[in-house]
Each structure stands twice: as C-alpha cells, then as structure tokens.
Amino acid sequence: MTSKAVVFAYHDIGCTGIEALLNAGYEIAAVFTHADDPRENTFYASVARLCAERGIPLHAPEDVNHPLWLERIRQLRPDFLFSFYYRRLLGAELLACAARGAYNLHGSLLPRYRGRAPANWVLVNGETQTGVTLHRMIERADAGPILAQQAVAIDPEDTALSLHGKLRKAAGALLRDSLPLLALGVLPEVEQDESQASHFGRRTPADGLLDWHRPARQLYDLVRAVTQPYPGAFCQVGEQKLIVWSAEVVAGNHGREPGSVLSCDPLRIACGEDSLVLRFGQRGERGLYLAGTQLATELGLVEGARLRGAASGPQRRTRVLILGVNGFIGNHLSERLLRDGRYEVHGMDIGSDAIERLKADPHFHFVEGDIGIHSEWLEYHVKKCDVVLPLVAIATPIEYTRNPLRVFELDFEENLRIVRYCVKYGKRVVFPSTSEVYGMCQDPDFDEDRSNLVVGPINKQRWIYSVSKQLLDRVIWAYGQQGLRFTLFRPFNWMGPRLDRLDSARIGSSRAITQLILHLVEGTPIRLVDGGAQKRCFTDVDDGIEALARIIDNRDGRCDGQIVNIGNPDNEASIRQLGEELLRQFEAHPLRAQFPPFAGFREVESRSFYGDGYQDVAHRKPSIDNARRLLDWQPTIELRETIGKTLDFFLHEALREREAQA
C-alpha cells in the first residue's frame, strides 16, 4: 500500500527530500514551501520549480499552523509529514495530522547543533565532523527520537558551500536507505541524549566581524563559514569595509599587535595567535573580487598599519538600564550582571536598601527617583543605554483589588511611556510580562505561543494586573512588527532572599511565602486562603536570574521577538504544602528559640482576605521548552533549598528589626 505524505520543504535539501520520497514510492499529496526572499542570495535549487515540473500541488502560506491550513491538511489524510529544511516550526496540532508520524531531516548529528545554520556553525567552531539526522518531530525543535544518521567528514579546506554539497549527498543516501524501512514500520527510534544537546541560533551578517585578538585558526574558520554565497567575514580599514573571501593561517605574528599589517605581498595580518594571509576579498559591498596584494594597494595599506575589528581597543561594556533596580528582580539581576564583568548598570528606584551592597561598584550607577516624575532623566538614559528593563510594577494580589486604578496607571501607562522611548531611540527592551497573563487557562502546561489567555468577568478586579500586562505585551509585539527589538519574559513565582519586606507583609502587600513567614515570626496563625489548595510552580531566584541574564546576553540574537517562561515545573506545590515545608524548616532552624510558638493553620475565605473582586487560579505550570531551546537553560534548585534560603533571610531580618526597636 502506498504511503501518503505531506511535505514541508525548502532549499537544495528540500529538493533532495522530495526526490527521495518519490523514488521510495511515496505519494506526495502536497508540498509547502517558502516564497524566495529577494534580499537573500538564493544559490540553492528551487522546491517550487521541482514541484511544478513534477505536477505536485504546492503552497507557500505565511502561517502553516493557521486553522484554515490545518483543516486542509487534515482533509488530505496523510500517513506521514516530512520536513526538509523548512524554516518554520510545525505546531502540535499540525504534527498530529499524520497518522503514522511527522519526521524532520536536520543538518547535524543530533543532539549536537540543534537550531539554525548548523553547517555554518560547525565550521565557525572548527569541527571535523558533522552529518545529517532523520528524527521524529515533537513540539520542541530538533529534540525528537532519532531514526537514522549519516556522518560527514569536514576537511580543513571546506567552506559552507562545499560542506552543504556534502550534506546534500549524505541526505540523499540516508533517505534512500531509510524511507522504505519507515514505510514498512521497521525503522527503530532512539531517544536523544539531552546531556549532549547543544543549540545554536540564527546567524546575521554582523556575526562575520573579524576580531584580530583571536587566534588565526579561529578567524580562518569564520572566513570559510561565511564566505560566498554568504555575506563574508569583514573588518574596517579606516572608513572602508574589507570583506575577506579566502584566507590561510601562517605560523607566528612577529610579536606585533593584533590587526597589524605584517606584509602587503602577501597581505598578512597579525592575530592574537599566529597570523592570517588574506588571499582574496573585496572593498565594500559593491567592490571587485580581488587578490589580497591588490586589495592592499587599493586600500592604501602599508606594513605596520592597523586594521580595525572586534575588540580593537578596550571593549565597551553593555549599558543596561534597570528601572525598579531596588526591587526583588532588579537587585539580584544587577548583582549578576556586575559579577559578569561585561555590563554597566544604570538604575532608578524610590529606595535603595536592597542595593546598598552594590553602590561601591564603579560600574553601578543609581539615582533615587520616581519614573512618573523624572521623565527627562528617564528619556535620556533610555537613549544612552543599550538594553532597557522596565521592572517597576505593582505585583501583589491584594493591591489588584485594593488599588486597581493605581495598578493600571503604573503597570500599563507608565511602562508604555518607557516602551515608546525604546521605539523612539531604537533600543532593545526586555519586558517583564507575568505568569498572571495566562489567567484561568486550562492547559496542563502554559505555552507562550499556544496557550489561551483567559480571565474572569469585569467585576473581578483582580484581573486588572493580568490584562494590563497582557495589553502591554501585545503593544510591544505590535511595535516588534515595526522593528522594535524585544524579549518578553514571564516569571513563575520566583522566591529567595530580599523577595519582600516583613513590613510589606504586615499590611498584606507581599508575596505568599513572605506572608507565611510573618505569621511564624509573630506567632499568629498561618492563614490559608480557601484552604491553600492552589498550586504554583516556585522558582529559585538564582535560577530565574541566570535565565534572565542569558536573555540580556542574547547570544546570536536568538531571543529577539521571543516570549520566554522562566519557571520550574518540577517545583510544583500547593500553598498548604509550601506552608507545611516552611513550618518544618522553621522548627529545625537554629534561630527557632527566638520566636513564639507555632499558632497553627487557619483556613480563610479569599473574600475576607483579599476583598471583593478576587478570583483565584487552581494551577499555574509553565512549559519551559522556549527557555531550554533559546537559552540552553534548565532550573536546578529544589524547592526545599529555596524555602530554606528565604526563611533564613527573613528570620535574620526579623531579629534586626527587633534589635533596632530595642
């Protein structure tokens, strides 16, 4: 019986995959591809032309996961879906359309080099072997079980183009051998080893910048990874751009400074280790393809001249503006960025008690102020800095019902002004969305790109925080379509030292664990709202801040235009369970004798605790596939450890308060 397939394909390897399916006797019901981008150098074969010649129905929708296309694909009743170098992720509903599964051909030996442009990345990293992998598709990109692999040797002279040719040939051989077995159902699957996984994002022309302080071998690998038909490696010669198409490594650099011209015939440049001969290149985007010696003449180079590239002088630190720098996330993040050594932090807040320890750092600049008042300072620093984090917000549930208009004014209106400054000055914004935007979503795991955002009726004012954040998420997304660089991150119940203050808990304006600790410290009953059955996934602040720091670092631009949940799905617990573990650790703490006896648990109704207009959520569990894929991040700290650190901090704070009042 003939197997029916729907194919998603682009590039040479898309053509290779289609030919292999036809040769293996598959019926191709339809092919989905991309319209060629006029800005891209399309050196590869055309899937559209192949399908036209073979009489195969062809489509190029903007969104293949759209319900209209999903229904059309379901009506085709495919046995298999295949993806051959298709550039968009296929969603879970689409993958489920295939009766016998969905399969992807990836251009590396998975689990290594997941993600984009693997052929370029393996060359940049100096690998000696890569290959192709046929694997089952799951929701997470390039992570499904492996069915077949074929290795490809990388020769020292290989470029991205020659390696692509090798991969195309290997793909043809792999599919020739595997597709008949897959149709028979006798091709075994092997789960990927996640401990060996690596992920790489898209490359841009800017990634070709030559840093002469690096070893010549690394620069040679960069040149061959991005040479024609790609944009090329480059550096600056005065005001002119020098694009390097071919190079070779020569031992030694005569002890000269990186970037120094050692000779003009051949054109030889000193590197951090050894030197690089520039064999062929061109001057500027429209220049002629020339030999290195003629390039030296055209550019006016002489022995001893210096070429400019990355890190040609002291590297300027990335300037990060943190508004709300004294808050829980702000102060922990500032500490992490300053420790990294690559950042300069500028911050504003209405207080500074949590950041006193940072003020002595010469790369930390703090101004006490209010974002609603100090608009000139705010606009100037958005213009001055590279990355902006507007962390100022009211984020405690009791305030949503007690001061809903203030929540809207601060969380939406004031932050919208900051976002518009980022648009005006072309600055990247990393915006704190919230797990609250998912509201009463019924999905078992909340997915950034697929889960519905569900809130209650208008008379339940607690949702004003959720919808204020959601509306700003949507505004930022819309600005992103016009060129704003952004990342939205959604924290899921981060906990740790300096989360709140006990004074805040005394007036009810704090997070759950601070409220529970206050009851233990003061010897009052722990109040469990509606019995404390609500479940949350608690995340250690150190885990959360590490993920956020990676978003700010934004390696290879992979976080641009993305939404990222930052939470720990393994640390799910009810509020009652949180209280019970807190009590257990409190009773065992060395400072236990300094505090009153435990007064028990008391169940209270949410209305009596939060007031009218409150509505709770039974569970809130994140999918962290985006964080794993984009950040190579996985939370590691168990809830018990986080509770212990948080409890210890607040018990010592309580004793300091007592001493101050004595």
UniProtKB/Swiss-Prot annotation:
Keyword flag Lipid metabolism: yes
A Gene Ontology biological process term: lipopolysaccharide biosynthetic process
Sites marked Raises pKa of active site His: D142
Active-site residues from the entry: H106 (proton donor), E436 (proton acceptor), R620 (proton donor)
Top-level taxon of origin: Bacteria
Keywords annotated in UniProt: Antibiotic resistance, Lipid A biosynthesis, Lipid biosynthesis, Lipid metabolism, Lipopolysaccharide biosynthesis, Multifunctional enzyme, NAD, Oxidoreductase, Transferase
Residues reported to bind NAD(+): D349, D370, I371
InterPro entries: Arna-like_SDR_e, Bifun_polymyxin_resist_ArnA, Epimerase_deHydtase, Formyl_trans_C, Formyl_transf_N, Formyl_transf_N_sf, Formyl_transferase-like_C_sf, Lipid_A_modif_metabolic_enz
Region annotated Dehydrogenase ArnADH, chain positions: 316-662
GO MF, one example: carboxy-lyase activity
Positions bearing the site annotation: Transition state stabilizer: N104
Record family assignment: In the N-terminal section; belongs to the Fmt family. UDP-L-Ara4N formyltransferase subfamily.
NCBIfam families: PRK06988.1, PRK08125.1, PRK11908.1
Alphabetized HAMAP family for the sequence: ArnA
Name recorded for this polypeptide: Bifunctional polymyxin resistance protein ArnA
Source organism of the structure: Pseudomonas aeruginosa (strain UCBPP-PA14)
